[in-house]
Regions:
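Flexible glycine/proline-rich, aromatic-decorated loop/lid segments
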Residues: 1-28
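Short beta-strand segments
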Residues: 1, 35, 61-65
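Glycine/charged-rich beta-loop-alpha catalytic/anionic-binding loops adjacent to active sites
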Residues: 27-32, 170-171
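Active-site/ligand-binding-proximal alpha/beta "capping" segment
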Residues: 30-51
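Flexible, low-complexity linker and terminal segments
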Residues: 45, 50-216
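N-terminal start-of-chain detector that recognizes signal peptides
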Residues: 3-8, 33-35, 148-152, 198-200
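Short, well-ordered, mixed-charge alpha-helical segments that flank or form enzyme active sites
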Residues: 4-6, 41-42, 69-72
């Protein structure tokens, strides 16, 4: 992210791309948007982002900026066991027993089984037009409604159960509470620490979509 319009300040920091990332697209679809504020968050959130993208088969965005990219400091060694990326693909052994494979199968979670071409005997069809469960083009209104429900409402519900909790700092007795996301973490924390005459706290969001309303 950088100040705009056009190329703007390509080596400076801004957060003006948020609305674009939240809403741009052809029609509605589920997505997740992460906004890490520290080096540690950037590392662990990236692992989480890959897992959410693989599990729900959706686009996931990590919004950073020059300030975070250029920052450096001493940190604790990353815990590599804290998060590992899972692929959520039908295993090669299970693929051998898969018959009548439906790439866009209707499920309770909205997540369709994902197979690797050549691992199963069936042909895998994928289409960018509205499609049937098998992947063939369709203009059937009922199927279209079910597909929207599958890939948006059901997936959104699942993603909402795996939200990153906001970071709260000095909220007890605070007269002013700052709210921010991304690299504003550092400046908000410093303001709270140096404010001698006012009680100031902050809430930092490392995930802005789905919005963590239940955690606020």
């Amino acid at each position: 992210q950088r100040p705009a319009p056009a190329t703007g300040f390509p080596t400076r920091t801004a957060q003006a791309d948020l609305e674009f990332v939240l809403h741009a697209g052809h029609g509605e679809f589920a997505r997740a948007v992460y906004t890490p504020g520290t080096i540690e968050e950037a590392f662990y959130v990236t692992i989480k982002a890959f897992n959410i993208a693989e599990k729900y088969q959706i686009p996931v965005f990590i919004m950073t900026d020059q300030h975070l990219a250029d920052s450096y400091r001493n940190i604790e060694t990353f815990d590599l066991d804290k998060g590992k990326v899972q692929r959520y693909i039908i295993s090669k052994d299970d693929s051998k027993n898969t018959k009548n494979y439906k790439r866009y199968q209707f499920t309770e979670s909205g997540i369709s089984p994902r197979a690797i071409p050549s691992w199963i005997e069936d042909v895998i069809y994928a289409d960018s037009d509205e499609h049937t469960e098998e992947g063939h083009i369709t203009e059937d209104a009922d199927i279209g409604r079910k597909m929207v429900e599958k890939r948006f409402y059901k997936k959104f519900s699942g993603i909402s159960q795996e939200i990153e909790r906001p970071t709260a700092y000095k909220l007890g007795g605070a007269d002013v509470v700052l709210l921010g996301f991304g690299s504003t973490y550092g400046v908000m924390k410093e303001v709270c620490d140096v404010a001698d005459d006012r009680k100031i706290g902050f809430i930092h969001l490392s995930q802005v979509w789905p919005f963590p309303a239940s955690e606020m």
